[in-house]
Amino acid sequence: MGGISVWQLLIIAVIVVLLFGTKKLRGIGGDLGGAVKGFKKAMSEDEPAKKDDKDADFEPKSLEEQQKKEAAPESKKDKEQA
C-alpha cells in the first residue's frame, strides 16, 4: 500500500548498478567499510582510557561497613550522656 515492496527495491538496485557500475560500487562499499572499521577501532581504543580514570586512590567500601563505622561513635556518645 504505502510501503516499498521487494520488487521495487530490486528495480532500484538494478538502476543503481547500471548508473554507477560494479567497480565504482565495490570501491564505495570498500571505502564505507573501511570508515566503519576505523570508527569502531577508534571507539575501542577510547574505552580503556575511560575505565582507567579514577576519582580517588581509595578502595570503595560497602554501605554496611560505612553504617557500622558511623553507628559506633554514636553509641559511645549515648553512653557518655547517660
Curated annotation (Swiss-Prot):
Biological process GO annotation list? protein transport by the Tat complex
Composition bias (Basic and acidic residues) maps to 42-82
* Entries under Pfam families matching the protein: TatA_B_E (PF02416)
* Bilayer-spanning residue ranges: 1-21
Which region ranges are annotated with the description Disordered? 41-82
For this chain, one GO molecular function annotation is: protein transmembrane transporter activity
Which GO terms of the cellular component aspect does the record hold?
TAT protein transport complex
**InterPro entries noted in UniProt:** TatA/B/E, TatA/E
Is Cell membrane set as a keyword in this record?
yes
* Cell compartment(s), UniProt: Cell inner membrane
Question: Keywords, A to Z?
Answer: Cell inner membrane, Cell membrane, Membrane, Protein transport, Translocation, Transmembrane, Transmembrane helix, Transport
Q: How does it sit in the membrane?
A: Single-pass membrane protein
Question: 4Fe-4S: present as a keyword of the record?
Answer: no
Task: Give the protein family.
Answer: Belongs to the TatA/E family.
Q: Which HAMAP family match?
A: TatA_E
Question: According to its UniProt entry, what is the function of this protein?
Answer: Part of the twin-arginine translocation (Tat) system that transports large folded proteins containing a characteristic twin-arginine motif in their signal peptide across membranes. TatA could form the protein-conducting channel of the Tat system.
Which NCBIfam families does the UniProt record give?
Answer: PRK02958.1 (NF002813), PRK04598.1 (NF003396), tatAE (TIGR01411)
How does this protein assemble?
A: The Tat system comprises two distinct complexes: a TatABC complex, containing multiple copies of TatA, TatB and TatC subunits, and a separate TatA complex, containing only TatA subunits. Substrates initially bind to the TatABC complex, which probably triggers association of the separate TatA complex to form the active translocon.
Q: Enumerate the PANTHER family for this protein.
A: SEC-INDEPENDENT PROTEIN TRANSLOCASE PROTEIN TATA (PTHR42982:SF1)
User: What protein does this entry describe?
Assistant: Sec-independent protein translocase protein TatA
**Which organism is the protein's source?**
Vibrio campbellii (strain ATCC BAA-1116)
